[in-house]
Amino acid sequence: MSPTLRLTISTPASLLVNAQAIVALRAEDGSGSFGILPGHADFLTVLTPCVLRWRGTENIRRFCAVEEGVLRVSEGHSVTIACRSGMLGDSLAALEAQIETARARTLDTARNARVEQTRLHAQAVRQLLRYLRPSRGDA
């Protein structure tokens, strides 16, 4: 049994974390919050949107917000997390600020897309009305 864990967190686009010396990890799934220590039994679970917290051998806490994912523990020392997206932070306050900024940017993008969609829809309706209505000069 190894006294540390190896943590890998990846998204489809990047490798967020590849840490060799982790002594403890906390995460959340549908049943609630749980912790993983070196020597943990093999384990597979689906994560809910949560903030992963871990501590390395240097006793520094790290954080990663994930938007759902799959966590796998294998051989008692390897923890692998695959998620759709993740955001790293050295403190919860900084991570919260990053998440709020990203959420605001996402909402703004969605709002702009809805406005553009409405504009295109109105333009298409006007074009159809021009085509379907006979012009006054043709009568």
Curated annotation (Swiss-Prot):
Q: What do the Gene Ontology cellular component annotations say?
A: plasma membrane; proton-transporting ATP synthase complex
- How does the protein associate with the membrane? Peripheral membrane protein
Gene Ontology MF terms? ATP binding; proton-transporting ATP synthase activity, rotational mechanism
Q: Which SUPFAM superfamilies match?
A: Epsilon subunit of F1F0-ATP synthase N-terminal domain
Please name the InterPro entries in this protein's record.
Answer: Alt_ATP_synth_F1_esu (IPR024037), ATP_synth_F1_dsu/esu (IPR001469), ATP_synth_F1_dsu/esu_N (IPR020546), ATPsynth_dsu/esu_N (IPR036771)
Give the main location: membrane
Name its cellular compartments. Answer: Cell inner membrane
UniProt keywords, alphabetically:
ATP synthesis, Cell inner membrane, Cell membrane, CF(1), Hydrogen ion transport, Ion transport, Membrane, Transport
Presence of the UniProt keyword Cell inner membrane in the record: yes
Q: What does this protein do?
A: Produces ATP from ADP in the presence of a proton gradient across the membrane.
Family the UniProt entry places it in? Belongs to the ATPase epsilon chain family.
Subunit composition?
A: F-type ATPases have 2 components, CF(1) - the catalytic core - and CF(0) - the membrane proton channel. CF(1) has five subunits: alpha(3), beta(3), gamma(1), delta(1), epsilon(1). CF(0) has three main subunits: a, b and c.
Name of the featured protein: ATP synthase epsilon chain 2
